[in-house]
């Protein structure tokens, strides 16, 4: 009876948990593979707008909305 319980626990609990964990890893690997295929111009198009979000201010006007540039 104990052997049957161990067998049922293994196949009904542990095996599905291991399978679900493997499925969760696949989209991340696929997304990383797609990002590596971008050419440098496409990468630059994605990065430059993010860099332009900050504005450059003088030290007298420096606050949280801009970077202090000298």
UniProtKB/Swiss-Prot annotation:
Expressed by the venom duct. Keywords: Cleavage on pair of basic residues, Disulfide bond, Neurotoxin, Secreted, Signal, Toxin. Disulfide bonds join 56-68, 57-66, 62-69. The keyword Iron-sulfur does not apply. InterPro entries: Conotoxin (IPR004214). Residues 25-42 form a propeptide. Residues 1-24 form the signal peptide. One of its GO terms (molecular function) is toxin activity. The cysteine framework is III (CC-C-C-CC). Classified in the M-1 branch, since 1 residue stands between the fourth and the fifth cysteine residues. This is Conotoxin PnMLKM-013. It comes from Conus pennaceus (Feathered cone).
